[in-house]
């Protein structure tokens, strides 16, 4: 049996936009657009990677808003993520298709997002 791997980005591929925009950022009493603008500004001002900038600012904002920073809390947000239509059964359908064609299909999600939400 042949083996293939399918790799996906999460944000914008499996769900619309950034996963944090759906509930996490709004639950910190933040405007999503303003948050990402501040991430860009912080990144340029401090000459740091935008991903590190967003992680730092999100942690800071969550702490200030008293939003729990824990694996369990991120899991709760992840369970409520709204995925694109068809994503929920996509992985099983492709695995089944692979089996019928003597192919083992493995799925991998590659993301710089919060993996505990995925």
Predicted features and spans:
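Alpha-helical substrate-recognition element adjacent to the catalytic core
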Residues: 1-118
